[in-house]
Amino acid sequence: MLKWALIFLVVGLVLGALGFGGIGGAFVGLAKILFFIAIALFIVFALLALFAGKKISDSI
């Protein structure tokens, strides 16, 4: 899960640079939407990794 969280963080940062930096031109709106989706998925997967890892370590 943490792997996916880091992937979505990188995707979000790249899309943010393209969308908010104005490099994307016609794709600015799409890049901004995908940026927020990627950041939301990063948060979800980071929390899942945190809580799942804690439950696994507690059961050992």
From Swiss-Prot:
It comes from the Bacteria. One of its GO terms (cellular component) is plasma membrane. Keywords: Cell membrane, Membrane, Transmembrane, Transmembrane helix. The keyword Cell membrane applies. Coiled coil: none annotated. Belongs to the UPF0391 family. This is UPF0391 membrane protein Swit_2334.
